[in-house]
Design a protein with these regions (language model features):
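S-adenosylmethionine
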Residues: 1-391
Length: 391
């Protein structure tokens, strides 16, 4: 493919990404893969170049553009040499005078008032920097120092005692340490959420929104003698956990829940859990550096829906915590409505509960929780709070 043809291909891919973001369809990665499966003539250099163009355009545009062409025209505004490719054979049509171009922005304009007040303008760029690859060592089987010997490019993560940081383009799925269940891919921020739970041998722990089980596995590694129940309403995600647990040597019970009947399906855990972790569904605004198109998918209506889900999950979790037990709430979000404001709302309705400072390194106090961000902590952005039920 010529450079002009690559540019045209990027426009075609971005058209699909824009439509998919609007309609809550497949992510950009999947769209790029599908595009080239249908075009076997494209070589590896072509695929790499088109993918890079697509994600540069996505990172540049905070708002969902009207079209893939608008996204690329906007990118060309920043890189004048690219304009020369418009109008070339197999390339896009020439740019017209005054043609609409996607504006450059870090975040959607409508979201700015929703940000935590701790987020300064100077942190916006870090929200979209490429994230490193973080590993979590399975400390039930090995130590970080021992595992680090097998990763010459790795360094200890500064905040999590379990973490190893690798360059962003590292591959680990074929590494002997991965095959042996000694490491899992997990951002340092997610590791800190597990640390905030302070799991102990003998604890009864419920991971209410376990997904594919990354944090449940971290809890099991930190406290092999704990009894862990991992639940979720997404069958596809939860079904991945048993194989992961087997590889890690972890004993974790899984249970598929059916909203809105979660409490009935968890009756055997009511007021019996030492720890309940609510790693709630959220806007994903803290993970934009890994998923920049998430900015294109989020709308005010979707944010309202997810905030309501978070409120409901917190209320369910409160019913499971034993007297004297602890509830840990976390979201990979930098928006106040999903973080500090959620805890304020919960405590308004549960005034006897006690707010505790999560026992983690890093972050800044944000209401009655802590906020970590890429710009301040070099982790994904997330909010975490810990609450204790009165005895």
């Amino acid at each position: 493919m010529t450079p002009a043809a690559r540019l045209q291909a990027a426009i075609e891919v971005l058209d699909e990404v824009v439509a998919s973001a609007r309609d809550d369809g497949p992510p950009a990665d999947s769209i790029v893969t599908r595009y080239f499966k249908q075009r076997r003539y494209a070589g590896s250099k072509d695929r790499r170049a088109v993918r890079e163009l697509v994600f540069r355009a996505i990172r540049r545009s905070g708002e969902r553009p009207d079209s893939g062409r608008a996204a690329i025209v906007g990118l060309a505004d920043d890189e004048p040499d690219m304009l020369e490719l418009f109008g070339e054979p197999r390339g896009p049509e020439p740019v017209n005078a005054g043609e609409a171009a996607a504006p450059s922005a870090f975040i959607p304009r409508w979201l700015e008032p929703e940000l935590s007040p701790l987020i300064a303008d100077g942190e916006f760029a870090a929200l979209l920097e490429r994230a490193p690859l973080d590993l979590r060592v399975n400390v039930a089987r090995s130590s970080r120092e021992e595992v680090l010997r097998g990763f010459p490019a790795g360094v200890p993560t500064p905040l999590s005692p379990w973490g190893i940081r690798l360059p962003s383009d590292s591959r680990v799925d074929d590494h002997p340490a991965y095959d042996a269940g000694l490491v899992e891919v997990q951002d340092e921020g997610s590791q800190l959420i597990a640390l905030a739970c302070d799991p102990r041998d003998g604890d009864a722990i419920v991971d209410l929104c376990a997904g594919a089980g990354g944090k449940a596995l971290a809890l099991a590694a930190a406290a092999p003698g704990a009894r862990i129940l991992a639940t979720d309403s997404n069958r596809g995600r939860l079904s991945k956990l048993p194989d992961r647990a087997k590889r890690a040597g972890a004993d974790i019970e899984t249970r598929l829940l059916n909203p809105p009947n979660e409490l009935g399906e968890l009756e055997d855990s009511r007021e019996k859990a030492d720890v309940v972790l609510v790693d709630a569904p959220c806007s994903g605004s803290g993970t934009w550096r890994r998923n920049p198109e998430g900015r294109w998918r989020l709308t005010p209506e979707r944010l309202d829906r997810v905030v309501a889900v978070q409120q409901r999950l917190l209320d369910i979790a409160a019913e499971l915590v034993r007297p004297g037990g602890r509830l840990v709430y976390a979201v990979c979000s930098i928006l106040s409505r999903e973080g500090a404001a959620q805890i304020d709302r919960f405590l308004d309705g549960h005034s006897s509960w006690i707010s505790e400072d999560p026992p983690i390194a890093g972050g800044r106090s944000d209401g009655r929780g802590r906020l970590l961000t890429p710009g301040h902590d070099r982790t994904d952005g997330f909010f975490v709070a810990r609450l204790r039920r009165p005895c």
